[in-house]
Structures are given as C-alpha cells and as structure tokens.
Amino acid sequence: MSQQDLTSDMLTRIRNAVRNHSANVTCLNNKLNRGVAQVLTDEGFIEGFDVVDDGRQGRIDVHLRYGERGECVINSITRESKPARRIYMKVDELPRPLGGLGIVIVSTSSGVMSDRLCREKNVGGEVVATVA
C-alpha cells in the first residue's frame, strides 16, 4: 500500500498508541520522521526510538513515555503543515503551545528542531506539528 504522507501517518500511529496505552509503536522510516522522533526524544515526550533496517524502507520503533500514575506525557499531537497546505513561519511568528509547556516541531534549512531551538538559532521554517 502506498503512503502519501508518512509524517501524518506517524503522528496518527503515535496518537492511537497513546489512546491504547501501548508502550511502543512502529512507523515507517524517512528523514523527516527520524527528525520528528529525535525532537520528541530531546524534548522528553518519548523515551526514545530505534531505527530498524528491514531490507526495504525500514521502520522506526518509538518508545512512548508514561508518568508515575500511568498517564502518557503526550496529551495531544497535531499535524499542522500538510502536503496540500504548507505552513511556513518566521521565527517571531512561531506560537508557544500551552504557554510554553508544549512544543512546535519545525523543519528548517538547519534540520528538524523544536520552536525553542528555532528561537535560539533565529531560524524559521515549515511548521510540521504541535505537541502538548
């Protein structure tokens, strides 16, 4: 089956795994998905991820993070920029989800990074997703 938007598919799989209280979720591998997983790891929303080579495209195993009472750290994860409607923002236009408690994942010319890192490096780009 052909997937058109692998990043939307990855975010939907993570959202469904959070609802089912799954420990791990498997997603298809590409450069943007690896970047999104790295940002989620760096910001503490997931435990980590493993890139598995299966002889074809490969896959990413994402390990979700849960709190002491069993609640997932990710409350919401939303795809912002879509293939039919790309959203680009300058660094001063980037929103602060939940007053700074959430993050915006941005694809820049310097790689995929969070809105906090974009403000430090003073770069804007395509808004990929919002995580809270």
Language-model segments: residues:
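Core subunits and conserved enzymes of cellular information-processing
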Residues: 1-132
